[in-house]
Amino acid sequence: MSVDSIRYKSYNNVIDTLKCIGEKHLNIKTVTSGDIWTIDLEKNTLFPLFHINPVNVTVGLHQRTFNFQLFLMDLVEPDSSNEQEVLSDCLEIMNDIIAIYKHGEILYKFNDEAGEEDRYFINDDFTIEPFTEEYDNAVTGWVMSFAITVENELNTCNIPIDNTTICVK
């Protein structure tokens, strides 16, 4: 395994890592990704639900920042009697996700060439906003903007292009 395959992460790596964290968290029952309007909130969906909504990617000379909206939601009783409890539980799970990216050993792989080093970088502070929606089920939870920065290399040496001719016209 080359050092580059460890350091430079693709969109697939970033999404799959977020999904894995959600799938391994013992309090999350369903993990989905894609546009927020594609969430299936039918009565057969298992909750709490963790949804990853891609927003955009910012590419810089040495880094790529993947911007997401992360949703964590659970069912609310028809009379909303458990809304405070649901909000509290979902907020703790959101806090867990931040903690895993800040300090979680499951995001590190030791490699003799690269050593143990961060592969994913996140901000220090997050604003997490509550929401309530009524579909087939009434759900409440939290949404936060979550930016994941990874190393990037804008290197023309590895581009699969026929460079036998110059493209300047």
What are these regions (language model features)?
Residues 21, 86-90, 139:
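Ampiphathic alpha-helical segments that act as solvent-exposed interaction surfaces
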Residues 24, 151-153:
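Secondary-structure boundary elements
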Residues 41-46, 91-150:
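Acidic-leaning, charged glycine-interspersed low-complexity segments
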Residues 2-16, 61-65, 72-105:
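Extracellular/virion structural assembly segments
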Residues 28-85, 121-138:
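Short, solvent-exposed beta-alpha or beta-beta edge segments that form flexible loop/patches at the rim
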Residues 1-63, 109-114, 158-159, 169:
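Small/polar-rich, solvent-exposed N-terminal microdomains that initiate assembly or binding
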Residues 99, 163-169:
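Short, cationic low-complexity segments
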Residues 81-83, 155-162:
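Short, charged, solvent-exposed linker or helix-capping segments at domain edges/interfaces
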